[in-house]
């Protein structure tokens, strides 16, 4: 039978440790959840699989990555990526987390080591997505520069590009409901330092604001 079908029915524990791996070369055998035409480096992967569901953890030290996080998004080119990644998935629920994840893009943008978690559940009948996310630290200027590469809803991406936020966010907690491409409900809690937002039409903008 097809390898993909076999993997969907695979159950058991996995452990893989490689000093060097060509991730793009594995595409013939592994169905990555994102488009990954290039990438190499060291990794250690372990976890449990249960017939199309599972929990997997990976320690990675990768270089020269090209990755696309959505079908309509451009490829993000990374010089390096390091940290621990965790994935927990079922038919209607996904969770992705990272510990001390740091990135360096090919054009020199550096993302400092960050802990984060994103999980979402899709209703089988309505296809509505309920999501939650958290992050220990976010550099808003860096996030704005990466906005066009991230799987954000159209409104959020436009706001980032239009207002060009600056500053640092700490202890972020967010939740949302997504119906198709429409963000129908959200909540947000975070601390912020030296927050700045560019003015636009009736929005006055701000700079140097700190608080919660």
Name what the model sees in each region.
Residues 120-123:
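Short amphipathic alpha-helices and their capping/turn segments at secondary-structure boundaries
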Residues 1-105, 126-202:
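Extended amphipathic, helix-rich lipid-handling scaffolds
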Residues 208-212:
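Extended, hydrophobic alpha-helical segments in both membrane/secreted and soluble proteins
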Residues 112-116:
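Polar/acidic, low-complexity leader/linker segments enriched in S/T/G and N/D
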